Amino acid sequence: MKLGAFSISLNVKDINVSKEFYENLGFKVFAGDIENNYLIMKNENNLVGLFQGMFENNIMTFNPGWDTSANKLESFDDVREIQKDLKKKGVKLEQEADEDSSGPGSIVLMDPDGNTILLDQHV
């Protein structure tokens, strides 16, 4: 199962303070819009999303079809195929992608400890 690029999406209290903190660790703004309270910070192949007021808990995010620079991969497992595979294995999904659609789609699941995992396909 190819899940694509991995990032952690953090619920932050003050996006400006968090931006400065991660810049001190060598991260640079890669994407996002601070005026809309979200930034994607990058340090080599490591991605950290900073989100102020958008969700309650931190989220592990995988992007099927993307590499760590948000370039489309030539070969990847579509989120709907991943969804079918997970359902066959008995994994409970909190949110499902429309199986009759194509292109962008997402699914949400929880690990055994209650950590949220988002598979968010943009291509």
Where are the model-predicted features located?
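Conserved short beta-strand elements that form part of the metal-binding/catalytic scaffold
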Residues: 28-70, 116-121
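Loop/turn position at the start of each blade in beta-propeller repeats
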Residues: 3, 36, 102-104
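Vicinal oxygen chelate
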Residues: 13-16, 54-55, 62-116
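N-terminal beta-strand motif that seeds the catalytic metal site of vicinal oxygen chelate
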Residues: 1-19, 123
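Conserved acetyl-CoA-binding loop of GNAT-fold acetyltransferases
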Residues: 23-30, 91
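Structural preference for long, well-ordered alpha-helical segments within the folded cores
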Residues: 20-24, 113
